[in-house]
Amino acid sequence: MTRKNTTTNPWAKFHGPNLGYVIEQYDLYVTGAGSVDPELQELFEIFGAPSFQDDVVTGDNTATHFSPQNTGNIEKILKVVQLVEQIRSFGHTLAHINPMEDGANGQSLLEKAMNELSDADLKAIPAKTVWQDAPEGIHTALDVIHRLKEVYTQSLAYEFSHIQDSEERAWLHQMVESNSLRQPLSNKKRTALLKRLTAVEGFEQFLHKTFVGQKRFSIEGVDMLVPVLDEIVLEGAKNGVEDVMIGMAHRGRLSVLAHVLEKPYSHMFAEFKHAKIEGAVANSGWTGDVKYHLGREQVVSNEEVSTRVTLANNPSHLEFVNPVVEGFARAAQENRKKSGLPEQDTSKSFVILVHGDAAFPGQGIVSETLNLSRLNAYQTGGTIHVIANNAVGFTTDSYDSRSTKYSSDLAKGFDIPIVHVNADDPEACLAAANLAIQYRMLFKKDFLIDLIGYRRYGHNEMDDPAVTQPQVYKKIKNHPTVRAIYADQLQAAGVLNADEIETITQFTQEQLKSDYAQVPPADTSDATIHVKVPDVVAKGIQPIDTGVELDSLRAINEGLLSWPEGFNVYPKVKKILERRKDALEENGKIEWALAESLAFASILQEGTPIRLTGQDSQRGTFAHRHIVLHDTDTNETYSPLHRLPNINASFSVHNSPLSEAAVVGYEYGYNVFAPETLVMWEAQYGDFSNTAQALFDQYVSAGRAKWGQKSGLVLLLPHGYEGQGPEHSSARPERFLQLAAENNWTVANLTSAAQYFHILRRQASILGTEAVRPLVLMTPKSLLRHPLTLSTASQLSEGRFQPALEQENLGTKPNKVKRLVLSTGKMAIDLAAEIESGKHEYNLDEIHIVRIEQLYPFPAEKVQSIIKRFKNLEEIIWVQEEPRNMGAWHYMAPILFELAGDKVKTGYIGRPDRSSPSGGDPFAHKAEQELIVAHALDVKYNFRQDKLEIEVFSN
């Protein structure tokens, strides 16, 4: 029997969905239709049905008492509660967010739910029943529904229901439902907004009329992108942000440069006119780039605050700038001037990424970059994404470019709040921008604005869009611009009259004309094509002594082999480390990983920060590095490089996600913005690096020539043919060599630990100088512990990196040498190992071997001096493990022909042309490799075709 207590009402604390749940449970309790939570069952026994009192305004403004104790009322309350949640979750499906559509962008289950409740039903239910935080003036459920529909189904629409954190979700709904976002703008700000839109529209129309047919990739149709960026930048500045990083493609870029980054109109016009103008600062390299790819850095300010804004240089490869800009931000956020990990302050900088509606779901680099947003090594405290949504990709409609309702749907999987906004509603757009920056600064997470507009012209200004979208472009032709729409609104509201609006327009036009008048005629004084590489680049890296005193190396090694008392190193790892204890003593040998650690430590002691990332970089893919130790009992980590004495620079090493493109882009961006830092990316296997090929092609190899953007990024690409098949053999060195020109980077394939030590230190020494350039290293796998790659302490303490090395104990009888063999990396070690093994007899007096350690720039002077020693030389042979159409051969062939002259033959020994880098049969691989070595070392084989498929030929 129910023991109803009338003195206390526990149901008063339940509202909305929680009350709905309690009512459902009571229904089950009464009917016995299902199990009820024991605690609730006890409450039902004591207090009876959920009931409460509230003042409900009726039609005659009298208060009435409502109790949901009968089944009919329970069902109605549940329907209202569900409807409230559906409006919050699906209101966007009824919202007017597309300026090219007359009403809502689709039908939804909301309509059905609303039709199931009459106005009378809704009036009978108190507002607090379904909306605990209902604002003043909201008395009944009918008021609630009207208010929420007004909030969620107008020109601003929200998708928050996928957000997993309840605190964040509640904050977002509170911000939206409290109406604090849509407070009326002051007349001053509304006038300023109209002036901004007038400037944007006027600029685009001036370009359209003045430079007919020239590509500019107009912003028209999403003009509000500029005020949205303005709002985000200045609100960020008010929060103390020092750097705002922007990444965007070419659409609207010129307007963003001119307005957000304050690039003078006259400078923009000069670029269109191909004229030189006084005061213009070229932000391009020696070959340059088109105007809508160039970036800019500018301190932006108003009466209150200022901040530095950087618009990243950008290729036409859509979205690949995203990770680069994220790297910029992380570099700006970190203090690298202390030992240990860098100290990150995410309030110092943030990123704005402007996406295309076709590219955001279409380009995989987008999801790769989004995946970085919550990772310790890559998070930047939240990025604000803006999709400049013009509903078409070149000529492709949205139904052909994505499989989702919205172009933004990908972001849901990364727990990112989404706001859709009609680009023809300027004040709604600013509200979206304001919500975005507040959320980012509070929660340090990503936020997305889907700015939905249209594209007034074709993909470029020479394109006729009506050919492929005739109906849409009939609408667009007759559709007023957002400036005109907003001007009419301000006139109707009495903010401005027609004359004042016309004055604003005329002022903009006069300014544009005045700035255009400053531009001189096109400069045709130098009609010849002349590309001048800066001398410091053309000269290459000058020889640098990189040895470290032996006592210092020994002290470093001692520190590398120590860890805190009580720290339990994994026994197998402990043995590996302990083997390094005497490596720097007499008769000791230094393996690759130790040479690397010694180089890192010495570089840190000289004040250069280091950042190393890769999929298994803390341990090393081949279990060789062990630069981060794990306690076997607690799983705590420790890196000896964080505790070495005399270090005032940070060291960070991180395991990366399973991504190449985004991570390479990120590290490149980090290095560009932190040029004093030795930034290294390591591929798990070099074979997988080609998934970042766009970054190598567009940024790492060419960024300086195109944009003057210097980088010292180091790429560690494990490479070597060991019978492991076509996906674990080749880092595709031929591709890096094909891209090599104008001393744009260094490509090397080393054969000793000492060489690795010295080239790392050489790279660190040029950071932050005009001589800096990326370093591409084909790193070893089986050679990591190979006896012939080990080095002595004196080889580290003395000397420098050698671009070419001669094989010891060969060439001692110069007049007898007939064949000079050139090779690189593992191939060179295979030749040396065969000689040392003594298994076969070769006439070694007739052979000399040179290891080409630095493939590019090729050490021509060094090799030429070696050739001159051998007066009876008959042939110069290039030997490689890769197929003939891969590896270095096609790069080396013209070099060898030039070195050999008329009297000496040149030739190739190696595998023939193949479509796959390597075979899958380890036994066949071994047989081929042995034959290559035999051909190279035995002059009697002189250009003979053997039964096995090994290519041997001469000129």
From Swiss-Prot:
Coiled coil: none annotated. GO terms for molecular function: oxoglutarate dehydrogenase (succinyl-transferring) activity; thiamine pyrophosphate binding. It catalyses: N(6)-[(R)-lipoyl]-L-lysyl-[protein] + 2-oxoglutarate + H(+) = N(6)-[(R)-S(8)-succinyldihydrolipoyl]-L-lysyl-[protein] + CO2. Gene3D superfamilies: 3.40.50.12470, 3.40.50.970, Multifunctional 2-oxoglutarate metabolism enzyme, C-terminal domain. One of its GO terms (cellular component) is cytosol. GO terms for biological process: glycolytic process; tricarboxylic acid cycle. It comes from the Bacteria. Its cofactor is thiamine diphosphate. Keywords: Glycolysis, Oxidoreductase, Thiamine pyrophosphate. Its EC number is 1.2.4.2. The keyword Oxidoreductase applies. Homodimer. Part of the 2-oxoglutarate dehydrogenase (OGDH) complex composed of E1 (2-oxoglutarate dehydrogenase), E2 (dihydrolipoamide succinyltransferase) and E3 (dihydrolipoamide dehydrogenase); the complex contains multiple copies of the three enzymatic components (E1, E2 and E3). E1 component of the 2-oxoglutarate dehydrogenase (OGDH) complex which catalyzes the decarboxylation of 2-oxoglutarate, the first step in the conversion of 2-oxoglutarate to succinyl-CoA and CO(2). Belongs to the alpha-ketoglutarate dehydrogenase family. This is 2-oxoglutarate dehydrogenase E1 component. It comes from Bacillus thuringiensis subsp. konkukian (strain 97-27). The lineage of its organism: Bacteria, Bacillati, Bacillota, Bacilli, Bacillales.
